[in-house]
């Protein structure tokens, strides 16, 4: 006869009512952070799970190193604060830390994530909106880690309205491939005394884009310019020599109404690194140091073939902290941080010559073609 056993598991849960603070918000632990599906593994999207948080799509559509923008209880989008291990993590425009890929990677290294939407306590400041705080993972006496890769492509995607099939764009829709991969490892450097935790995450994306734009009619590229109203000119029906090299950069129409379409693959490469060291100096002294770096490169089209921008973003955040316990009721934490953001946008010169250079102190003027 088989034995019958009964097991009772008691799992600690957060109290439904907070009797020690008037703050409103929510805590997401490491298990929930790991289990919740996130498009692009952008952990800032966890914010939108909270009541009172609204996404500002008009701020994110450009996708240019602005991170994620949201409004908390109707407050302006620049009224939110972001902290990692107790130090600021804000981009140059006032939003969350983000890259040229418009993502904030590093979810594999997050131990705890919290957002406070109202009634901030005295330890926070500088904001009238919400307060996001992130605690990174640290090593333990046991080695542990993870490996992952996520693949997304266009096999099951639907064609949107602008993906028009032409001789130039014969495919059903532009190709799209995204690979998110990486891992983490942590453990002891000296048992019970010194620990490490390292995280790497990579993003490789090839985003197909169908561009549709108005271009210059073929009749307006030949001299003399037609007088049927197709081309605008002031008396002289010739094309200025200075304009001809610029005119040659614009493609001929391949759609009705002087429109042009062409396919373009926008490549993006992002690499995220984060390392943390924890040191138990003595029973009354602990310290840690963490370095976070994210570097992204992207090539983005500007409406016509050959018109592109090479984009680079590099974010670096360093935190060093030491905590000393004087008495059971008195302790002090000394913390130092450093942050740096590098942004670089360059476009190749399609025409050359001093007549096309911008002179400092002189207006750019207006070119009519």
Ranges and model annotations:
Residues 1-369:
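Short acidic-glycine motifs
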């Amino acid at each position: 006869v088989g034995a019958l056993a009964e097991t009772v598991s008691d799992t600690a849960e957060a109290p439904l009512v907070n009797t020690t603070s008037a703050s409103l918000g929510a805590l997401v632990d490491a298990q929930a952070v790991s289990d919740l599906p996130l498009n692009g593994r952008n952990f800032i999207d966890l914010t939108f799970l909270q009541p009172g948080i609204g996404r500002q799509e008009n701020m994110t559509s450009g996708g240019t190193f602005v991170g994620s923008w949201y409004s908390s209880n109707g407050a302006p989008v620049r009224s939110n604060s972001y902290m990692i291990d107790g130090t600021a993590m804000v981009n140059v425009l006032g939003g969350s830390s983000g890259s040229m890929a418009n993502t904030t990677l590093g979810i594999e290294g997050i131990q705890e994530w919290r957002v406070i939407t109202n009634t901030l306590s005295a330890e926070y400041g500088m904001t009238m909106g919400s307060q996001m705080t992130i605690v990174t993972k640290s090593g333990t006496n046991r080695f542990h880690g993870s490996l992952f890769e996520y693949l997304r492509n266009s096999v099951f995607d639907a064609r949107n309205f602008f993906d028009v099939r032409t001789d130039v764009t014969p495919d059903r829709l532009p190709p799209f491939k995204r690979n998110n991969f990486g891992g983490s490892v942590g453990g002891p450097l000296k048992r019970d005394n010194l620990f490490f935790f390292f995280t790497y995450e990579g993003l490789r994306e090839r985003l197909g884009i169908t561009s549709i734009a108005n271009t210059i009619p073929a009749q307006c590229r030949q001299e003399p310019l037609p007088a049927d109203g197709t081309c605008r000119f002031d008396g002289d029906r010739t094309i200025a020599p200075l304009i001809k090299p610029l005119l040659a950069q614009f493609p001929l129409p391949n759609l009705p109404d002087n429109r042009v379409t062409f396919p373009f693959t926008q490549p993006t490469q992002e690499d995220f690194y984060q390392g943390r060291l924890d040191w138990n100096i003595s029973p009354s002294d602990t310290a840690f140091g963490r370095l976070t770096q994210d570097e992204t490169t992207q090539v983005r089209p500007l409406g016509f073939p050959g018109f592109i921008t090479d984009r680079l973003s590099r974010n670096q955040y360093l935190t060093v902290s030491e905590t000393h316990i004087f008495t059971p009721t008195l302790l002090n934490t000394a913390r130092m941080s450093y942050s740096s953001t590098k942004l670089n946008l360059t476009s190749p010169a399609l025409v050359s010559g001093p007549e096309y250079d911008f002179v400092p102190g002189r207006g750019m003027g207006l070119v009519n073609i």
